[in-house]
Amino acid sequence: VIEGFVPLPGLRLAYSDTGGAGTPVVLLHAGTGSKDLWEHQIGPLHAAGHRVIAYSRRGHRGSDLGPAEAPGTGSGDLLALADHLGLARFHALGTAAGAIVAMDFALSHPDRLISLTLACTILGVVEPDYLALSQRLRPPGFMAMPADFRELGPAYRAANPSGVARWLALEHAAIPGAQLRQPVANAITWAALRGLDLPCLLLTGDADLWAPPPVQRLFAQHLPRAEQVVIAEAGHSAHWEQPEAFNAAVLDFLRRQGSGPYEGHKTSP
């Protein structure tokens, strides 16, 4: 795996890249995570023939925070990464806030994507009916609860204390200093979703406190080419809690988005 940096004005973003000639998959971490939280996905996706790239957004482990007066957008930074690595088109796989960045990118640059996988996410939809639903799911005091309670399902916390400890260690290391809130480039509305002509996989855990299955079904009503998978015994971090089921669902979806050699590199990696 190659460790590198994307140069941006006033900062650098850290990435890991397996290299190879396979169709690229770019992994976008949760709002509390970093590229390190994909340790259960990078190997299996690469073994299935993909070039796998994970990166840390601004202020997350390995990446600079950058100037506060020029925060840019998460989707703009993803475009810079894709251009830097010579990716003409790629699969985007985002979890939680990473899926919001992926969706924002898809709305701005649909021609750069082969597919979109949106996992365990509130998706940043700004419609009043959806915002009211979100508020019902997260009552006052929710954000004061321990991180592992909010982000990991009860089945995983009961069955895998060592996995919880590993997750907590990576989470604690993920944001070493100040945090930066980057705006989105697009208003993520129902109309915007309806206009998106891309294959989309919606994945969530059956015990996700942020985005339970009915939320996923609501998104699917507005995405013309959406598929849905619910991961059993998983919370808001399904990729970490149930990686075998998560990876199987993702690989099945990716496999059906065209076959043959990948011809989308702008330049050699």
Predicted feature locations:
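Conserved alpha/beta-hydrolase catalytic His-Asp/Glu region
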Residues: V126-P128, A132, P140-G195
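Catalytic active-site module of serine/aspartate enzymes centered on a nucleophile-bearing elbow/loop
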Residues: A226-P269
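Short beta-strand/loop motif that positions the catalytic acidic residue
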Residues: L196, L202-T204
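Acidic catalytic loop of the alpha/beta-hydrolase fold
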Residues: A207-A211
